[in-house]
Amino acid sequence: RDLHSFPTRRSSDLNPTVEAEVTVKADGKAGELFTGTAIVPSGASTGQFEAVELRDRDDRFGGKGVQNAVKNIDEEIYPALEGVNGLNQRKVDAIMIDLDKTDNKEKLGANAILAVSMANMKACAKALNIPEYKYIGGITAEKMPIPMMNILNGGAHASNNIDVQEFMILPVGACCFKEGIRWCAEV
């Protein structure tokens, strides 16, 4: 297993965000290596029960830097996962959760943990030559997940008086993900 973090990525709102890259070696494939990457941008607001996105809270980027989260990947998460079979996603995730030891992921940062977990999932799906949704849902998963799209915002950070934070639509019945995206775009 090889794990890298990249501290200079930016999300769509130009805030720094965490990117992780995980490389796994597939058994029985002549030592072939498979790499997955994942970027974890932040939302505009967080609820009181959400996992904590670790931000630096210093002068850089208005306090929204992610150097501490990246440092946690490099110095705590990577050593804890070194030698662990990445194909056991539950074990990979359990190790990170146990390493954090908080209910809301405030020690390592949910952004660090999620980036590594997603990158591991993507690398392992490639190694097994299966779609990511089958890696997550099991090889008996018959349907690919459908997209959820936000069509109207309200709540504390909106410029209206709607109490509901998000109104979302799901293209239930679309034949494929691409068709679901089209249906939502046409709404």
Regions flagged by a language model, labelled:
Residues R9-R10, S42-A44, D98-T102, G138-E142, ...:
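Acidic, glycine-rich active-site loops and adjacent beta-strand->loop/helix elements
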Residues V24-L33:
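Short acidic-glycine loop/turn motifs at beta-strand connectors
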